[in-house]
Each structure stands twice: as C-alpha cells, then as structure tokens.
Amino acid sequence: MAIFNNTTSSSSNFLLTAFPGLECAHVWISIPVCCLYTIALLGNSMIFLVIITKRRLHKPMYYFLSMLAAVDLCLTITTLPTVLGVLWFHAREISFKACFIQMFFVHAFSLLESSVLVAMAFDRFVAICNPLNYATILTDRMVLVIGLVICIRPAVFLLPLLVAINTVSFHGGHELSHPFCYHPEVIKYTYSKPWISSFWGLFLQLYLNGTDVLFILFSYVLILRTVLGIVARKKQQKALSTCVCHICAVTIFYVPLISLSLAHRLFHSTPRVLCSTLANIYLLLPPVLNPIIYSLKTKTIRQAMFQLLQSKGSWGFNVRGLRGRWD
C-alpha cells in the first residue's frame, strides 16, 4: 500500500492538509518551506559531523549537542515526504498504517528532543554549580548511560499507545489539519471511545514533558542562585553566556509544542489554518534555528565548521589538481 497518493479519498485513508484555504498558493508556499527543510538538513548534518570528526569536541556538552542535532535531523526526515508531497504534488492521502508509523516517530523524536534538552540542562548545572567535579560526574560512560536512557524512554511510553491505537477502527476520508499525523487529531476519528486514548496521550504529555520542563526550570533556579553568588561580574556574565544557547533551544521547542497541544485539546474552535501553521512551526522551528544558534554563539563549533569546510574545499582542490596532472 502506498504511503500517500493523490487519488480520491477512501475509507482506509486520512487526508493531509498543508494550509487550509491556501491551496492555490501551495507552489509558492513550498519555496520557503523547502528552503527551511534544506537549512535544517544541512545545518544539523554539519553540527553532527563536526562533533563526531573533531576530537577536541569529544566532551559531554558537545556529545549532548550532537544528540540534539541527530534528533532534529530525524524529526525533519520523518515529516519531509508528506509535507512536500502535499505542497508539490497534492498527494494528500495517507494510509492508516503509514499514518500510525509516522505519528509514532513524530512523537518519539519529540520526546527524544525533550529528553536531550533535560540532559543538556543537567550538563550546564554540573558545569556551573559543581565545576571541580564536572569531569568525574559526566564521564564518557555516564554520557553513554544517559544516551541509552534517552533512547529507551520513548519506546517504553509510546509503544503501548501505538498498540492501543492499532486495535481500534477509524473513520476514513477525514481531513487532518496538518501535513503529518498528530495524535490528538487522529484519535478524534475512532469508532470506539476516543477519550481513552486521548486521555492517555494527554497524561503522557503532561507527565513526560511536564516533568522535563520542571527539571529544566529547577536546574536553572540552582544555576541562577550559583551565578548570583559569584562576586566578579565578568565571571557572572561568562557563566550565564554558556546557558544562552540552551535557553533558546528550550524556548523554541516547548512554546510551539505547548501551543499546538492547547489548540487541539482545549480550544476546539481554533481555525484550521492556525493549527496547520502551528504544526509547521512546531516541526521546523527547532531543527532550523538550533544549528544557527549554536554555530553563532559557540565559538568552538563555529571554528570547527569553518575548518571542516576548508578541509573539504582543499581536498576537492587537490583532487582537481591531481586530475589535471593525469588528464
């Protein structure tokens, strides 16, 4: 069965929507959307590649940043086919099975990103509040354990939800408000009582994301208390500057996530075009902005990226030179 096609809707498919009411402008809208996807793919790939290849970046802070880049890259790839399929080819149909698979990965990678942001907050907490023991607390083994917990966490909580959804029947042919499958909207079209799965989804979001947000806030309360206790003003500013990128990453991830969730669960009269816009912001804002923020604010990352680009350029020049000698 095809993942999506542009045929007439059937009872075993959902209809995806990019921007309701703006179908005539989809070709023009696809230009900035495609540019944003390109920036997200190239930016996160570059960040990940730089951290993996440069040995001086093999430190806990950069390990967590590479995890964030990898998650953003995967989240971008998960929704890329359906978003561009709707905008370019009007390929609106998606089968139930493909929808469930995409929905699982969208929510799994979102939960992964939330977990990585928590790990990064812990890293900043240890670096500022307990700098003398930073190397002994965040060892390579500890970073590996944290990474494994981050990967296992979505499977433990989301697989039961996916199994439960797979056992119920759905009304086919309904239009979704997004160019991808999102649990709070998909679950509305079940024949059985949708409130059970909806309640479980709400519980998971409040429990998991809520716990993550509280942990991050608590970490920054302790960080702020430590920074305010520093006498030298320059040292205060330096300590706070190391947290700016992470605070930006937390903001651009949680604000769209919470806004989209509230629009679906509490404000049922929200215009569909607004829901679609929020969905695209939720998907694209973190993957696009995170590489830009970290490359601009982190001198080490910026220098490593320039060095990598220069080495690739010089390698290409040398190859062309060798070809010129033998031609």
Curated annotation (Swiss-Prot):
Sequence intervals crossing the membrane: 28-48, 57-77, 102-122, 142-162, 199-219, 240-260, 276-296
Topology of the protein relative to the lipid bilayer: Multi-pass membrane protein
Residues of this chain annotated as glycosylated in UniProt: 5-6
Name of one Pfam family that matches: 7tm_4
Subcellular localization: Cell membrane
PANTHER family: OLFACTORY RECEPTOR 51T1, OLFACTORY RECEPTOR 56B1-RELATED
Name recorded for this polypeptide: Olfactory receptor 51T1
Organism: Homo sapiens (Human)
